Amino acid sequence: MRASLIEAQIREQKLKDEQDFYRIHLSIDAQEDIDKLLRFAKECHSQQPLRKLIWSEYFLKPFGEMAGRILGKDKISGIYKITNIKDGKIYIGQSTDIKTRWSNHIKAALKIDSIAHSRVHDAMGEEGIWNFTFELLEQCPKEKLNEREKYYIEFYQSNIYGYNKTVGGA
């Protein structure tokens, strides 16, 4: 247990020191364009085409670069953390394919054919996706995902102070 605590503290300090490594890189101009387009989308009868355009033109390539830096090219099963760098709130999740899951989180924040919408998606949409870091906490096989997700939600208390609604493992 103590080793896990020390490992998590070291990882947290490294994340703060190397925050840009774990973020989607967008220029200020791109961020401003996205904000304008999302405001405009709210006035449109059919928002999906514009939101899909924002994904494909502004996020797809930078997302691929970020995911490649963090995960490499292989399909990764494990536990991940999404952190709001403005307020420090976090979300802990699990997936048998983390890259695809992260992509789905971003699309949900953009309100594109979304998975179940959640507090982390609302925050990403309001604060700007570029203000969130994506981190792989642990690789683990499918049969260990629930157990390890519960561990990290309890460790970070993200169901109390973050975006998780439950203690996880479902």
Where would I find each of the regions flagged by the language model?
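N-terminal mitochondrial targeting presequence
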Residues: 1-6
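Structure-specific nucleic-acid interaction/processing domains
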Residues: 11-15, 21-44, 49-170
